[in-house]
Amino acid sequence: MSVSAFNRRWAAVILEALTRHGVRHICIAPGSRSTPLTLAAAENSTFIHHTHFDERGLGHLALGLAKVSKQPVAVIVTSGTAVANLYPALIEAGLTGEKLILLTADRPPELIDCGANQAIRQPGMFASHPTHSISLPRPTRDIPARWLVSTIDHALGTLHAGGVHINCPFAEPLYGEMDDTGLSWQQRLGDWWQDDKPWLREAPRLESEKQRDWFFWRQKRGVVVAGRMSAEEGKKVALWAQTLGWPLIGDVLSQTGQPLPCADLWLGNAKATSELQQAQIVVQLGSSLTGKRLLQWQASCEPEEYWIVDDIEGRLDPAHHRGRRLIANIADWLELHPAEKRQPWCVEIPRLAEQAMQAVIARRDAFGEAQLAHRICDYLPEQGQLFVGNSLVVRLIDALSQLPAGYPVYSNRGASGIDGLLSTAAGVQRASGKPTLAIVGDLSALYDLNALALLRQVSAPLVLIVVNNNGGQIFSLLPTPQSERERFYLMPQNVHFEHAAAMFELKYHRPQNWQELETAFADAWRTPTTTVIEMVVNDTDGAQTLQQLLAQVSHL
């Protein structure tokens, strides 16, 4: 019996089973122990293969691919710390709903806890973060192929969101010519090999039913809060709220067009919060809210009913409102709960939103990151998409901009880490094939700098804006100790990104004014390559501008 040949047949069953659940993209890191999985993936023509030398970036690349494709994405890594590097992407997927299938090669059991090289305790290492965890045995003909395929089908067939960890131990030898070893074992699956359906089909998950008292609540004074959702859902939510006559507070990720812009500014005005207190019901569609003032209002509001609609399971309400947690696809839920045409009941808030936007516009001429956040709509590529980083940049765009309704916006706002942002943006571009504008801060770019290697392979123009404010200026908005702020919080690095772009043969610009920025964009959108635009700004101007606008709008 050839161990290497049977390893490959075992792996081929695993990989073929994944195709029956919509897996098309597969991300592969280099490694020896993962050879059976890698070769099985290479031989399966269903897959689109992606490679990267850094497993942490590879996990985030898969995350970006899954965000756009809405399908599970598989990742193959070797044993040891390579597996641990997938943890951040797995955590993010669990919070934002992407489906990741982590195929982690492992040493066989007799090599664990005995000093063998690159052998760690991998089963269960991700704790409760995967939706399902499978610890496979070493490949053996004593276990029928139908057990292997049905085990995978059960995990993937019941997967609605998050990750599946499939730990795959393989004994040596890992290399060798293929022979007939295990062929009869594999063939016992019969015509499954010619089919395209799972071996084991699971019943679909039950979703929340229609709320039978909706006809009653839609006649009340309501507020719609829109969190993260798809572009198509964002347009539908905007129309739904408009028909009801309810104010819509739209997050930067809602893609609703934010009909009441600058919410994070006007929610700091007592007139606005006083008017919102009249609401009898709040319907929150989507989770992962960004704005600080929005979260503060959400925590303090006490309507008669607070409904949260999202297809991700879990409470999704850090304020623990009394109400209803409705698990449903947002578009489907809107169809079951149609709006009834009513006149708007809020009078003060539309006026405050308009005045807040005018206050922002009055400051748009200075060359800074707050002004860039406001102007970002001017630079969006046609038929393209936006990827927004974390920390200060996403808060500024949320507070100061008004993104077009239905324009695709992506981010990592589950755990909201700054790790893996460039890798995720690369995945977003690859899965969509669209022109992409990505914007991150300087520390985020440094954190994932080797992901610039992934940005060499794009199918449409990609512009990466690095807002260089020399450190983590988000901490300027927090009551961090002034005496220790720079050393322990901001951590300025005093670097520029010209040489990093050159190392990966990417185009680079460092504009000094708006005209130069517009020229850089015009050049970047002409060719299907990546352009790094570094916008060097004064350290604290962005945070100070936001604070000044908050103070100004609070007194309107």
UniProtKB/Swiss-Prot annotation:
Pfam families: TPP_enzyme_C, TPP_enzyme_M_2, TPP_enzyme_N
Cysteines paired by S-S bonds: none
Keyword Manganese among UniProt keywords: yes
Keyword Magnesium appears in the UniProt entry: yes
Cofactor: Mg(2+); Mn(2+); thiamine diphosphate
Keywords assigned: Magnesium, Manganese, Menaquinone biosynthesis, Metal-binding, Thiamine pyrophosphate, Transferase
Swiss-Prot/TrEMBL catalytic activity: isochorismate + 2-oxoglutarate + H(+) = 5-enolpyruvoyl-6-hydroxy-2-succinyl-cyclohex-3-ene-1-carboxylate + CO2
Cofactor annotation remark: Binds 1 thiamine pyrophosphate per subunit.
Known pathway: Quinol/quinone metabolism; 1,4-dihydroxy-2-naphthoate biosynthesis; 1,4-dihydroxy-2-naphthoate from chorismate: step 2/7; Quinol/quinone metabolism; menaquinone biosynthesis
Family matches, as InterPro entries: MenaQ_synth_MenD, MenD_middle, THDP-binding, Thiamin_PyroP_enz_TPP-bd_dom, TPP_enzyme_TPP-bd
Enzyme category, top tier: transferase
GO molecular function: 2-succinyl-5-enolpyruvyl-6-hydroxy-3-cyclohexene-1-carboxylic-acid synthase activity; magnesium ion binding; manganese ion binding; thiamine pyrophosphate binding
EC number: 2.2.1.9
UniProt GO BP: menaquinone biosynthetic process
PANTHER family: 2-SUCCINYL-5-ENOLPYRUVYL-6-HYDROXY-3-CYCLOHEXENE-1-CARBOXYLATE SYNTHASE (PTHR42916), PROTEIN PHYLLO, CHLOROPLASTIC (PTHR42916:SF1)
Function: Catalyzes the thiamine diphosphate-dependent decarboxylation of 2-oxoglutarate and the subsequent addition of the resulting succinic semialdehyde-thiamine pyrophosphate anion to isochorismate to yield 2-succinyl-5-enolpyruvyl-6-hydroxy-3-cyclohexene-1-carboxylate (SEPHCHC).
Subunit structure: Homodimer.
Annotated family: Belongs to the TPP enzyme family. MenD subfamily.
The protein's name: 2-succinyl-5-enolpyruvyl-6-hydroxy-3-cyclohexene-1-carboxylate synthase
UniProt source species: Escherichia coli (strain 55989 / EAEC)
Lineage: Bacteria, Pseudomonadati, Pseudomonadota, Gammaproteobacteria, Enterobacterales
Gene: menD
